[in-house]
Amino acid sequence: MIGELTAALGIRDKLFLATKVWTRGKENGIKSMERSMTLLRAKQIDLMQVHNLVDVQTQLATLREWKAQGRIRYLGITHYEAGAFADVEKIMRSEKLDFVQINYSLMEREAEASILPLAQERGIAVIVNRPFGGGDLFSRARSKPLPDWAAEFGCRSWAQFFLKWIVANSAVTCAIPATNKPHHLEENLQAGAGPLPDGKMRQRMAELVSSL
């Protein structure tokens, strides 16, 4: 669908296309990535990621080849559990990565210990998944009013509150909240507009969520 839409609208040059490979074996990896390129109708993918570190060394070897050939612009790895951070960190230290995608939220802050500082040190861009803690943050905030002081940094909803806390971290490049509702998508996008909370305000936000 994305490939059809970008082709029909002629907007490929305005998009950053990112996808992933999630299989074992070199040939299977190549088939998976070529299928993604076909579906996206793209001669070049901006970012290809080894998802959940599956056969990571094999797939990274292919990604390095593809990057040299110009078939992808950037390469990276992903995981969605803090339990994998030790392995993620090892790869960040041993491989030349452009991106790392990890879970990080007001309820899952383990990435602050080593992953985020290391990403800044090595110049690795960070994509945040599970920015709402798998929905647990909304469960905490349900029926709770958004604090008046959230307006100081342009927040009009809890979703924007949670997202702005994340993207205000200087180590974070972007967050990717999942949704299948257009009005939620529009609301989430607004978190990237306007002012962001500073360090003191982020601490205040974290303390509030901890008290919910």
Language model features: what each stretch is:
Residues 9, 23-110, 114, 120-127, ...:
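Glycine/proline-rich, positively charged
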Residues 94-99, 114-212:
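Structured C-terminal cap/extension of enzyme domains
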Residues 1, 78-81, 132:
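Short, solvent-exposed turn/loop segments enriched in Gly/Ser/Thr/Pro and often Arg
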Residues 17-20:
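Extended hydrophobic secondary-structure segments that form protein cores and membrane-embedded regions
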Residues 1-15:
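N-terminal binding-site loop/beta-alpha segment at the start of enzyme catalytic domains
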Residues 1, 85-86, 138-139:
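Short Asp/Glu-rich motifs
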